[in-house]
Amino acid sequence: MFTGIVQAIGRIEGLMSQSQVLSHPASPYSDAQGLRVHLLWGDLDPSDIAEGDSIAVNGACMTVIAPTDQGCFFDISRESLNRTVGLDKPGPVHLEKALRASDRLGGHIVSGHVDGTARVTGLRSRDESHELLLEVPSSLAMFVTEKGSVSVHGVSLTVNAVSDLNGQTEISINLIPHTWKKTIFSQLAVGDRLNLEVDPLARQVARVLESLINSGRWPTAVGHAFASASAPGSDLPVQGPRA
């Protein structure tokens, strides 16, 4: 679990195919279509990172392999490659260590399970900040709300506005100077794609409602909820019948 607060900008230094992995001293990788990635920590403190720990790389949760003071390796499956961008080529990446129970939740709950990618449709200066416009896949649009939270390339951000036009959903996000300075967003261009994870809580609520509706239990479940709310001792006000 993560919180969407980037701790350092690392770098993907190299990649190995399955045939190269089999001859590598680190543990062999079983996914013939996946990759093993060599990651450099950058300014991230690796003193508390051990083999098998989780780390978010551009918002995607990866398992640390063979960590050193300079970096580590991680394996990325074909499924992850299909759902993400920025993990299959050398370049700078956002890094965040897994959240401890005692840590501050500075952003929002981020699972590190990327849902898909969003396309940059605009990037412009707004006083001292920058406005980032993203086109969200239609399959994820229902989970994105105004003033809700999203993880974009591993960064916890607040959605300022949601626009639905001609079957496309575009969201507007404000990047404050601190975020602009501490991330790789300043390197973006229109047309680039970024990893997107919607709020896990929104996804879970939608899944429960979908299950209730598909099973035909939706009216009954709602009735039980209101019955519980109107029971003695409930603090939830329930409107009585009209005359």
Give residue ranges: language-model regions.
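Conserved loop->alpha-helix
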Residues: M1-A243
